[in-house]
């Protein structure tokens, strides 16, 4: 497999070079990632779509996370990250259909590695039922939708769990309906401010 290279940045997001993805995570270089939240509106309710990460992922296995995300490779633009929607969810979207809602810095310590990201966050509105999505099964093993008002109460610690509904895929590729209450241990631990950026944009109607 061809080695993947990423552009690296200082803390002010000034370009300082190019390193392999392995070295970026080993040495904790800042790099860019594409995060896209798929939004589904049903009547007066608005839902965010969360993906369930594959159980063999090296980071946050089996946890629920942003609808679609990926690294921006060296020389790519942030908008090139739209390919992740196609690869992970089977969604054909054009860059001009996505709404850019901001950038947030995040830092994760994973074993001996340090993952420092400039997360470029986008919103994509899609009317399709999540059951129609085509998953990249070595990356994603399920999708759920969560209503944003309930999610906001959950993040503010006003409720202990949040209702999620969707499906999971087993090793044979069969889909099973999923309806359950999720708690904070079920989610990738993004900063509180990360989710606030997303919810504020949705509640302000972008």
Curated annotation (Swiss-Prot):
Its domain of life reads Bacteria
Q: What Enzyme Commission number(s) apply to this enzyme? A: 3.6.-.-
Keywords annotated in UniProt: Hydrolase, Magnesium, Metal-binding
Q: Which Gene3D superfamilies match?
A: Nucleoside Triphosphate Pyrophosphohydrolase
Sequence motif Nudix box, location on chain: 69-90
Chain ranges of the Nudix hydrolase domain: 29-169
The prosthetic group or cofactor this protein requires is:
Mg(2+)
Amino acids binding Mg(2+): 84, 88
Gene Ontology molecular function: any one: hydrolase activity
Q: Name the family.
A: Belongs to the Nudix hydrolase family.
The name on file for this protein is Uncharacterized Nudix hydrolase CA_C0446
Q: What is the lineage of its organism?
A: Bacteria, Bacillati, Bacillota, Clostridia, Eubacteriales
């Amino acid at each position: 497999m061809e080695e993947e290279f990423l552009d690296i940045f200082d803390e002010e997001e000034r370009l300082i070079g190019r390193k392999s993805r392995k070295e970026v995570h080993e040495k904790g270089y800042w790099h860019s990632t594409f995060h896209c939240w798929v939004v589904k509106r049903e009547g007066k309710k608005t839902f965010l779509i969360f993906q369930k990460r594959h159980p063999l992922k090296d980071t946050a296995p089996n946890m629920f996370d942003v609808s679609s995300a990926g690294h921006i490779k060296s020389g790519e633009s942030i908008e090139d990250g739209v390919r992740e929607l196609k690869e992970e969810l089977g969604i054909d979207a054009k860059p001009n259909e996505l709404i850019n809602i901001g950038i947030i810095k995040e830092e994760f310590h994973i074993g001996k590695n340090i993952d420092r990201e400039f997360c470029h966050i986008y919103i994509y509105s899609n009317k399709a039922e999540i059951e129609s999505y085509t998953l990249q099964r070595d990356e994603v093993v399920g999708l759920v939708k969560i209503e944003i008002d309930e999610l906001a109460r959950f993040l503010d610690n006003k409720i202990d769990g949040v209702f999620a509904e969707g499906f999971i895929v087993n090793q044979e590729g069969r889909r099973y309906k999923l309806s359950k209450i999720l708690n904070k241990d079920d989610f990738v631990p993004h900063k509180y401010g990360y989710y606030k950026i997303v919810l504020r944009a949705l509640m302000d109607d972008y």
